[in-house]
Design a protein with these regions (language model features):
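Compositionally biased terminal segments of proteins
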Residues: 1-172
Length: 172
């Protein structure tokens, strides 16, 4: 998030999914290694994704970490909207950690005007990003389970069902 916060693309990223729920509500039991985002404001092409990756890989002057892009893959072949999965290595000192970023576009969105303070994992700082409304996250997960699960069983994975369960407890 630090790199995206420093990027010229920051205003186009909308955070969503399990990472957002974990960061916002401190859901340690729903550990996630990927960052789900929706892009608005520009056309999401492979060239644009490569451009974003080049920025992410650039060393930061004041930071002691490095990102290396391992793979970029088109995703969402059965979906109504396109996307890309970026596999990265995050290197902090001698430790190397796999991270994934999913970039999607084209979803029908509720109005997005809210930013959220997202605490950073290896720092006492936080960054602000636009975020999906909770209703949008719930609707997306329910839609994915009901519509796409017949095509791909992995889509109805436990993590999507957990989000539905979480919302049922949140509203009690």
């Amino acid at each position: 998030l630090v790199k995206l916060d420093q990027s010229p693309y920051k205003e186009f990223f909308i955070l969503k999914g399990g990472f957002l729920l974990s960061a916002t509500y401190g859901l340690d039991v729903r550990a996630t290694r990927d960052l789900d985002t929706t892009i608005r404001g520009f056309s999401l092409t492979e060239d644009k994704v490569k451009e974003i990756c080049q920025f992410i890989e650039q060393p930061s002057a004041n930071e002691n970490f490095q990102f290396t892009v391992r793979k970029i893959k088109a995703i969402r072949n059965h979906f109504d909207y396109q996307g890309y999965n970026i596999k990265l290595h995050f290197q902090l000192g001698r430790g190397k950690f796999p991270i994934e970023i999913d970039l999607t576009t084209g979803e029908e969105l509720l109005p997005i005007s809210k930013t959220e303070d997202i605490p950073l994992l290896f720092s006492d700082r936080s960054v602000q990003f636009y975020v999906y409304p909770l209703k949008q996250i719930f609707a997306d997960k329910l839609y994915i389970i009901l519509v796409y699960a017949p095509f791909d069983f992995k889509i109805s994975r436990l993590k999507n069902l957990f989000v539905i369960f979480f919302f049922s407890k949140l509203n009690n």
